[in-house]
């Protein structure tokens, strides 16, 4: 049992997922609820291609500073951050705000 969510990597962050920007991800759920914290763990296990790239995305068990996180086009800080309970069809957008130039 479980459900699907969409995960997007923008602003150059797609380099951690073999340059694939959009992913449909099945969230396994046997009982209870899944949160963004669970989603972050799932992303590190199933989307990030090279374990060396995990620190590009994660720092101190959460999304690293400099990455804007949107849940259904709303800043995740307004949605409860890691505690947000996932729902089928949710869209999670991770955008790097750190650019060279």
Curated annotation (Swiss-Prot):
C-terminal thiocarboxylation occurs in 2 steps, it is first acyl-adenylated (-COAMP) via the hesA/moeB/thiF part of UBA4, then thiocarboxylated (-COSH) via the rhodanese domain of UBA4. The modification 1-thioglycine is found at residue 101. It is found in: Cytoplasm. It comes from the Eukaryota. There is a cross-link at residue 101 (Glycyl lysine isopeptide (Gly-Lys) (interchain with K-? in acceptor proteins)). Its main location: cytoplasm. Pathway: tRNA modification; 5-methoxycarbonylmethyl-2-thiouridine-tRNA biosynthesis. Pfam families: Urm1 (PF09138). SUPFAM superfamilies: MoaD/ThiS. InterPro entries: Beta-grasp_dom_sf, Mopterin_synth/thiamin_S_b, Urm1. Keywords: Cytoplasm, Isopeptide bond, tRNA processing, Ubl conjugation pathway. Belongs to the URM1 family. Acts as a sulfur carrier required for 2-thiolation of mcm(5)S(2)U at tRNA wobble positions of cytosolic tRNA(Lys), tRNA(Glu) and tRNA(Gln). Serves as sulfur donor in tRNA 2-thiolation reaction by being thiocarboxylated (-COSH) at its C-terminus by the MOCS3 homolog UBA4. The sulfur is then transferred to tRNA to form 2-thiolation of mcm(5)S(2)U. Prior mcm(5) tRNA modification by the elongator complex is required for 2-thiolation. Also acts as a ubiquitin-like protein (UBL) that is covalently conjugated via an isopeptide bond to lysine residues of target proteins such as AHP1. HAMAP family: Urm1. This is Ubiquitin-related modifier 1. The lineage of its organism: Eukaryota, Fungi, Dikarya, Ascomycota, Saccharomycotina. The gene is URM1.
């Amino acid at each position: 049992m479980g459900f699907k969510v969409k995960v997007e990597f923008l602003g150059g962050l797609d380099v951690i997922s073999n340059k694939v920007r959009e992913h449909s991800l099945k969230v396994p759920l046997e009982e209870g609820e899944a949160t963004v914290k669970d989603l972050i763990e799932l992303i590190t296990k199933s989307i990030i291609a090279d374990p060396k790239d995990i620190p590009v995305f994660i720092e101190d068990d959460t999304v690293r500073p400099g990455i804007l996180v949107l849940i259904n086009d709303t800043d995740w800080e307004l949605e409860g951050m890691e505690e947000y309970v996932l729902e089928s069809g949710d869209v999670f957008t991770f955008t790097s705000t750190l650019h060279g130039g």
